[in-house]
Regions:
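Transmembrane and membrane-interface helices of multi-pass
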Residues: 1-241
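Membrane-interface soluble catalytic domains
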Residues: 2-15, 28-30, 34, 53-62, ...
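A long, amphipathic alpha-helix that forms part
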Residues: 44, 48, 280, 422-425, ...
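Active-site-proximal alpha/beta segments of enzymes that process anionic O-linked groups
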Residues: 160-468, 571-572, 577-598
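Metal-dependent active-site segment of extracytoplasmic phospho-/sulfohydrolases and closely related
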Residues: 295-296, 487-529, 576-580
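Histidine-centered active-site microenvironments of extracellular/periplasmic hydrolases
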Residues: 311-315, 507-508, 512-556, 592
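Short glycine/proline-rich turn/loop motifs
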Residues: 345, 469-480, 554-561
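Acidic helix/loop microenvironments that form the catalytic cleft of cell-wall polysaccharide enzymes
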Residues: 443-447, 515-523, 599-602
């Protein structure tokens, strides 16, 4: 064996495989943790054994590594600058980014990337030639068949669990549970405490015992592709590693990521198929030759009462507060406090009470604007794929130009919203005379201290520089709130820059900003934070409209109506209708009474997701968390 390793060709090949396997451990060189490194290492070892056992010699499996070689520069780049490897989101960006956009994004690092790619290609070719020439590393003895048998057995066990599910870990007997979790009476006798179970303890203990099973010990359902009704795999046969360990491994884990990407694309296509043939038959009511730009900014996790524009004592909007043509809307609510559910209601005619249902049979205002002769842009600092993002991406794909610019996700390596400014400038300068630009910002998404540069870290103490703070830890309440307010300060700067761009030149311009939902922030004695709750802090969102002087001269009645309705009861359901009215776009079946910029405007019943569909304007506010509680009976929800 040592003689084989002493030969340079063999050593070069083995070191190549070792280097590829070491890619997931790159973050550890920078002092960053890797989740379950031993699991990843074990999975990689099994994967290499499987490849060698099945193909017998490196020359016959080396070609499988071509995707890994090609992906290596991107993987190292993402780990270096964003602290994460290639994901379905990154694959989506690569698939939808033109070479020109890629060059603009890489900037001065493009030559470094090209050099790295040439180096890797040289490495790939030379290692492949080496694998073809050497026969020293062939697996020829009988141990190969033993390995194949063991792999086949493991694959069979995995297939059984995948198809028929995995049984749950046995629950502790009720008698034992009674001693631990049943309702008890504490009786003080002779200076000691004795425990006596209540009469109703048994059923309660059984329920508690079942509920106490951790997620890792619960039953896992099978996919049921065969239709057979076999018993689930016994718990003892469950593989000792999670499937994520394979996805995080290299180089064979790329297969899993590619498959996830394929599933997301397929899911995206299925959602898009529901409205593929839909049309609004939209047109501009009074078209003219004047160039115009309409910008729609979708905010993230922003709270109405943390904007000084809305009366907050801290000056979080020093720049927007100086804009004479800005009309702040004081009573806008979102129906659901989750981005993937709230944004579709905002950008389409999807009713609030249908927001929990996936997909929608109609397209968004992007298509209506396109039909009316506008070139449309979707510029996003959010994620394109995933459970929480794909429903929004379905609508984003309607745009003529789509750019997802955040390679870092929501981590500490994510981009600030200012990354949207350069592509916005390009969109405004585009030769098309009429343009709609949607900016989907990262706003005040957790972790708050990662949403702004250091110079905006105004209120102290803050979370700035704190590694992985837990928002569930109420002891960081002051830091959490201070950092949150700094996100609003940065949002003010970002939006002021957007407006500043719209003021330049002689185009007719207008902008609408609406946040998708708010945040609860351990308010007073409330022990809740983040979002996904039924609190007024999360339903009441900041919103405003800004217009240029040229816009006001063209549409004085719209501007007058806007100012008149600044205190009207509004919801994100009004956004679609108002944004089309803002662009003077008409279509058959339109509901002008839903546009707060039109004289026909009427307030409508506003529903929010609170113990069913609660009538927001017929509800009480409960406790310091300000839960919205319907005075009547909430409507039943359908999902």
């Amino acid at each position: 064996m040592l003689a084989v390793l002493r030969r340079p060709a063999n050593l070069y090949l083995l070191l190549t495989y070792l280097a590829l396997s070491a890619v997931p451990f790159v973050p550890m060189l920078a002092g960053k943790p890797l989740g379950r490194p031993w699991h990843v290492l074990g999975v990689e070892f099994v994967a290499w054994v499987a490849a060698w056992a099945i193909f017998k010699r490196p020359a016959w499996f080396h070609w499988l590594l071509i995707p890994a070689f090609l992906a290596l520069p991107a993987e190292v780049y993402l780990y270096t600058y964003y602290g994460q490897g290639i994901s379905t989101h990154h694959l989506g960006i690569i698939a939808e980014t033109s070479p020109k956009e890629a060059m603009e994004f890489l900037g001065s690092t493009v030559y470094l990337m090209l050099g790295a790619m040439l180096t890797v290609l040289t490495w790939m070719v030379t290692s492949f030639v080496t694998a073809r020439r050497t026969r020293d590393l062939d697996w020829n003895d009988s141990s190969r068949w033993v390995a194949l048998a063991a792999l086949a057995l493991g694959a069979g066990v995995w297939a059984w669990g995948y198809e028929f599910g995995i049984a749950a870990k046995p629950v502790a007997p009720v008698a034992a549970a009674l001693k631990k979790v049943a309702a008890v009476h504490l009786v003080k006798a002779e200076g000691k405490l004795s425990v006596a179970p209540s009469a109703s303890s048994a059923p309660a203990a059984k329920g508690v015992a079942q509920a106490s099973i951790s997620k890792a010990d619960r039953a896992v359902p099978g996919v049921g592709l065969t239709g057979l009704k076999w018993a689930p795999l016994p718990r003892v046969g469950r593989l000792p590693v999670e499937f994520d360990a394979f996805a995080n491994s290299w180089p064979f884990g790329l297969v899993s990521r590619s498959y996830d990407f394929y599933k997301e694309r397929k899911h995206l296509a299925a959602l898009g198929a529901r409205n593929r043939n839909f049309t609004f038959h939209a047109r501009q009511a009074r078209p003219d030759a004047k160039a115009e730009v309409v910008v729609m900014v979708i905010g993230e996790s922003s709270r109405y009462d943390r904007w000084s524009l809305n009366g907050y004592e801290r000056e979080t909007n020093p720049l927007l507060g100086k804009e004479a043509n800005l009309v702040a809307l004081s009573d806008v609510i979102t129906s659901v406090s989750a981005t993937r559910l709230s944004v579709p209601v905002m950008i389409s005619r999807k009713p609030a009470t249908h927001s929990l249902k996936e997909g929608f049979a109609e397209k968004s205002f992007l298509t209506a604007y396109k039909e009316a002769g506008f070139k449309t842009f979707w510029l996003s600092n959010q994620i394109s794929f995933g459970e929480y993002d794909t429903p929004v991406s379905v609508f984003a794909k309607e745009a003529d130009v789509i750019q997802f610019l955040n390679l870092g996700g929501f981590t500490d390596n994510s981009n600030f919203d200012q990354i949207l400014l350069a592509p916005l400038r390009s969109a405004i300068a585009d030769q098309a005379p009429k343009k709609l630009v949607v900016l989907h910002s990262l706003g005040s998404h957790w972790n708050y201290s990662h949403r702004y540069p250091k110079q905006f870290d105004r209120w102290k103490p803050s979370l700035y520089g704190v590694d992985k703070p837990a928002y569930t830890n109420i002891s960081i309440k002051p830091q959490l709130n201070n950092s949150y307010d700094s996100t609003i300060l940065y949002t003010d700067w970002f939006l002021a820059n957007v407006i500043g761009m719209l003021k330049q030149g002689d185009q007719r311009t207008a902008l609408m900003y609406v946040a998708d939902h708010g945040q609860t922030l351990y308010d007073n004695t409330c022990d809740l934070a983040f979002h996904g709750h039924n609190t007024q802090f999360e339903f009441h969102v900041p919103a405003f409209v800004w217009y240029s002087d040229l816009y006001a001269a063209r549409h004085p009645l719209k501007v007058a109506q806007l100012r008149q309705q600044r205190k009207a009861r509004l919801s994100t359901e009004n956004v679609f209708h108002t944004l089309l009215d803002l662009g003077d776009i008409r279509y058959p079946g339109e509901k002008l009474e839903w546009s707060f910029m039109h004289p026909q405007f009427k307030e409508h019943k506003r529903y929010v997701d609170s113990y069913g569909w609660t009538n927001y304007d017929n509800a009480t506010v409960r406790g310091d968390c300000r839960e919205i509680i319907d005075k009547g009976k909430p409507l039943k929800q359908e999902k």
